[in-house]
């Protein structure tokens, strides 16, 4: 983009678009934008579901959605031009609507709990739970869709009355939303078109190559333990402990997208957990826990994995939560003081709020505020819709999950507006969505309230799911409103697009999940690890006071020890960052280390390979590496997700791979040859 100098703010974005009229609502939400949104929503929901079920890491789809929305729309324009079909010009506002709709749909993959509380309620996650009789609810397709429609829209309505406070008055940054807006603005300039074309070309190449690779691997995976996924990359001894590369391209793509520190933390956590702690605890088999238990029993080694990892995550979440609250409170007090100093008791919304403390609004601010305030949705309408949704949910949710009472649901919806605003405000200041943290707080509160005998585990998971959905969606809407503000997109158009994407996600995501779940139940799926489902089950069990019952020896002692260690690491990391010590770059993330206690080492191995590729690429060609590595990563993730759906469809249709390829040690190979020779002689 060619920014223009403005005497008040130095650099102006809107001067470059000054000659373009702001499109109306009908020119922004068009049939073209809805068709493109539907195609991309379905595709990226498949990808997000595959990632959340297999690894638990969900990268942001804001940039891929904006990029793909731009390129698919431009391609459709060229096709229609070829057939001489009249059409509206493609604007940045329409691009924003597509991005908003797609992200609203894919975000339900996370807030809908498909990889967390939905699976945590099932029998697979409850293996070894001695009180599982009233604390298990198997996934049901109809119940999932109904539940999502009940809980997914409340956050949208409750955050709308706060939009002017956060966007106009306090001018919250929302870093990810701002970055997405700048990306979309840059696309709609001549320079941006050239860059986007290069990115999309690489994205589709990696997308197609990954699908082809997935289909190629399928031909050699005719049975358990067959295929390239079981290649002993680092030798057979490392393979026995789970250290190998399984050629899952999604993990490589995630590693390319994640910050180096997160990948480094995951690597360190894998070495500590799978290389040191688990081998030591396994050596105590028969002493600390019975030796005849399966790997998924909470009475065995899984009990250590769940509660050690749980303790570290709790410590980090507690520390981050307190830090966010302190920062948010200080920011609000500081801005309030600046406003009072700038204009006394009658300070204008734009005065004394920005860090630069500019007394006069810039051209960009004036134009954006004009559009943002023009198409308003009355607060009475949004509040009324929230109240109506609350009443319906209070009446319906206890019928879907009998462990929840009417009073439980009512209390959640009564407290949600306060916490939704707090979470959205903190999200705007720090770019950290703490919906999952509030979810865990709700789980502890309602799990202890209901109790283990009355189904407290399921009640805790349902309460956490409602909380996470309302707060997570509210923060996402606030961020999308910021993106719309910076691209001159009407807040009414953003809200409508958000509602369409949410409704689409309430149908698409359960359908995609059900396909994966059906394949998994047939014995061919890749959901066996369920890292976050085990984590949420552990949280729920701890909330009902069932933590020590049936668990192996010393598990709760280790819980307390690792809680203290993780808290100390989080404090040390924060202090080092504030003091700007040199060592701060090498202090691992607590949450990054903790999640490795719930996943097999092959996932971090793939992430490390992806991070190494991105690092070497940037070292060799910094400009192209930074510009193209996100596109390559997106193609790998998308291709792996779509490839998984294709393989799942083959399984559902009864197709079987023709070849089995296995990797054996030299001794096992000699024994196998001898056995085959005896069979040949018998013939």
UniProtKB/Swiss-Prot annotation:
The keyword Protein transport does not apply. Expressed in roots. Disulfide bonds: none annotated. Keywords: Membrane, Transmembrane, Transmembrane helix, Transport. The chain crosses the membrane at residues 29-49, 51-71, 102-122, 141-161, 200-220, 261-281, 306-326, 381-401, 409-429, 441-461, 494-514, 556-576, 597-617, 635-655. It is a multi-pass membrane protein. Belongs to the YSL (TC 2.A.67.2) family. This is Probable metal-nicotianamine transporter YSL7. The lineage of its organism: Eukaryota, Viridiplantae, Streptophyta, Embryophyta, Tracheophyta. The gene is YSL7.
